[in-house]
Amino acid sequence: MRHFISVNQLEADEMYQIIRKANELRDRPNQLNRQLFAGNLFFEPSTRTKMSFSVAERKLGVEILDFHTEASSLAKGESLYDTAKTFEAIGANFLVIRHPSDQWISELEQGGKLNIPVINAGSGKEEHPTQCLLDLLTMYQEFGSIKGLKVVIAGDIKHSRVAKSNAMALTKLGAKVIFSAAPGFEDHTLDYPYLTMDEAIEEADVLMLLRIQHERHLHKAETSDYLSLYGLTKERYKKLQDHAILMHPAPINRGVEIDTNLVESEKSRIFKQMSNGVYVRMAIIMHVLSEWGIIHENNLIKRKSLTAI
């Protein structure tokens, strides 16, 4: 594995290996017995992804080299590649990068030779592989397998990196992917069937809602009647199958794609997804560092629990 940029890099058995490792880490956390440094380079706002990577790194015993774009040499015209090489030069063992560009990885690769692994924490509208794997873990915990599930992804498909990553991975694992989107929010470059929300509700084993990505629209989308036409209302929620679960990558626009009272409903696994994100990212970091030969099995020790004084 060169850098971890896309879920398409992983075979089905590797995906299951990572989500099973993440599941194991919830109960039996590991720590690394050697000093490692992570450079977290976030060029877009982030709450869940940035914080869960930070917690994952700390749980593994990794030192975090934090980065603030507004106080960095990027303001002086430094390239992404030179910034990454700087982190490598001062001792970072791996980088976690989120960037608004769809092509930032190409910029890194064309810049020269980077000798440490990069983990994609979200690339423009293209991919969000770590979010995808935590979503897969959440489904795996619920159903024991991904194969055969009908997963409806509903919302702003056109601008969603989550939709793309999940659709690819779910298909590889044998699930049936169905999209549902308001007019103008479809992405017809992705070859999946579309249903209306009312049709999709009755099909779904998993209903994954997406917010409208206003920051990627040229003009602000009108949302006053979005919930009633395309979102999850209380009436639609009642039509979900008994075993169906509700997911959302967040941030959530309450009252737009979902009725606010449904965010923590019985079927909702939204906050469980967030919790799973820490352990999936721990597993991904371990997987990537192992692939690069940076860590080995003998570098893992059982994490000591902290005793309150």
From Swiss-Prot:
PANTHER family: ASPARTATE CARBAMOYLTRANSFERASE, ORNITHINE CARBAMOYLTRANSFERASE, MITOCHONDRIAL. Keywords: Pyrimidine biosynthesis, Transferase. GO terms for cellular component: cytosol. The gene is pyrB. Catalyzes the condensation of carbamoyl phosphate and aspartate to form carbamoyl aspartate and inorganic phosphate, the committed step in the de novo pyrimidine nucleotide biosynthesis pathway. Heterododecamer (2C3:3R2) of six catalytic PyrB chains organized as two trimers (C3), and six regulatory PyrI chains organized as three dimers (R2). Gene3D superfamilies: Aspartate/ornithine carbamoyltransferase. It comes from the Bacteria. Carbamoyl phosphate binds at residues 48-49, 98, 128, 131, 250-251. This is Aspartate carbamoyltransferase catalytic subunit. Pathway: Pyrimidine metabolism; UMP biosynthesis via de novo pathway; (S)-dihydroorotate from bicarbonate: step 2/3. Its EC number is 2.1.3.2. L-aspartate binds at residues 76, 161, 211. It catalyses: carbamoyl phosphate + L-aspartate = N-carbamoyl-L-aspartate + phosphate + H(+). GO terms for biological process: 'de novo' pyrimidine nucleobase biosynthetic process; 'de novo' UMP biosynthetic process; amino acid metabolic process. It is an enzyme of class 2 (transferase). Belongs to the aspartate/ornithine carbamoyltransferase superfamily. ATCase family. GO terms for molecular function: amino acid binding; aspartate carbamoyltransferase activity.
